[in-house]
Curated annotation (Swiss-Prot):
Stated name of the protein: Protein J5
Subunit structure: Part of a stable entry-fusion complex (EFC) which is at least composed of proteins A16, A21, A28, G3, G9, H2, J5, and L5. Formation of the viral membrane is necessary for the assembly of the complex.
Subcellular location field: Virion membrane
One Pfam family this sequence matches: Pox_G9-A16
Any one annotated GO CC term: viral envelope
Main location: virion
Species of origin: Vaccinia virus (strain Ankara) (VACV)
Membrane topology: Single-pass membrane protein
InterPro entries: Pox_virus_G9/A16 (IPR004251)
Length: 133
């Protein structure tokens, strides 16, 4: 399709998922502004194989230097100390490692002196200082 045909189709079908890269929601554009990363570099409809993209947008997308990673936790089992992590970042490394599991330190350490005695102690200290100086 030519750029004119793409724009004509998307003008008539703004809610079509294939046109969402040309007409994204305002919230998507705002996220792009806030992160200082153009929305077309990370917005999923722009990555679709059937997305309708004019030539200028295709050119801009090729200049994106973003690694789009999807990391998901798979089988998490505390009893077997096993953690499967699925990393989809164009890397081919697959590692299965056993992780040592230990309980958190949950000891409660109480102060030596109760906090309610602090003002009385400070007052007594001030009286002693005033009495001797």
């Amino acid at each position: 399709m030519t750029d004119e045909q793409i724009y004509a189709f998307c003008d008539a079908n703004k809610d079509d998922i294939r046109c969402k890269c040309i007409y994204p929601d305002k919230s998507i554009v705002r996220i792009g502004i806030d992160t200082r990363l153009p929305y077309y570099c990370w917005y999923e409809p722009c990555k679709r194989s059937d997305a309708l993209l004019p030539a200028s947008l295709k050119k801009n997308i090729t200049k994106c230097n973003v690694s789009d990673c999807t990391i998901s936790l798979g089988n998490v089992s505390i009893t077997d100390s096993k953690l499967d992590v699925n990393n989809v970042c164009d890397s081919k490394r697959v590692a299965t490692e056993n992780i040592a599991v230990r309980y958190l330190n949950q000891e409660i350490r109480y102060p030596i002196i109760d906090i309610k005695w602090l003002p009385i102690g400070l007052l007594a200290l001030a009286i002693l200082i005033l009495a001797f100086f």
